[in-house]
Amino acid sequence: MIKQPALAQEQYACVYAWLALLFFREVDDEGLIQLQSAEIADWLALLKRQPALAASVALLEQKIAALSLRQDAQLELAADFCGLFLMTDKKSALPYASQYPQQEPGMIKHLLLEAGMEVNDDFKEPTDHLAIYLELLSHLHFSLGESFQQRRMNKLRQKTLSSLLEWLPEFTNNCLKHDPYGFYAALSQLLLAIVRFDDGKEDLSIVAAE
């Protein structure tokens, strides 16, 4: 069997940026069209070539295909997003590192400082939102293409991945348990698989709902 080459830095960067957007805000009508577009299908096909990502990509493809059968799919997805990520009850999956006891408080602020980044004033969510971690990883992967700072950026990438993996499995498990239609559950499983693949732990199994 021919081994597929690992993802390029630019591919990681684009995928992290795409996932950051999906976990940050509800999918609007335009976003729904994009999800079902040939462009996204091609991106998923690229990811699917990696054996460690194939199962989670296939699941997300199924959930995207199922959206065409869902009446008022955009409104339903918005309701799913709200129920999972904006509510504070026990049936949610809050996307904030501080909600998980495994995470050291304020870690993301230190990581951003090391990267020379600041959160935009227009960002109204707490700094430890999942989307900030993913935007940081996107930035770091783009920066890895610049040889003069490659070693420093790679070290910071590893620190960011390790920090994220302290709480991302529990977040993913919460999505699996509390997302009845499964789109965000599948999306979170793909994210976890990509982060583990990026971290060199692609052999670890995806968490399963209890």
Curated annotation (Swiss-Prot):
Protein name: Chaperone protein TorD
Gene3D superfamilies: 1.20.120.1820, HscB, C-terminal domain
Entry keyword set: Chaperone, Cytoplasm
Top-level taxonomic group: Bacteria
Protein family membership: Belongs to the TorD/DmsD family. TorD subfamily.
Subcellular location: Cytoplasm
CC per GO annotation: cytoplasm
Presence of the UniProt keyword Chaperone in the record: yes
GO biological process: protein complex oligomerization; protein folding; protein maturation
Gene from which this protein is expressed: torD
Pfam family membership, one: Nitrate_red_del
PANTHER family: CHAPERONE PROTEIN TORD, CHAPERONE PROTEIN YCDY
Function per UniProt: Involved in the biogenesis of TorA. Acts on TorA before the insertion of the molybdenum cofactor and, as a result, probably favors a conformation of the apoenzyme that is competent for acquiring the cofactor.
Disulphide-bridged cysteine pairs: none
Record carries keyword NADP: no
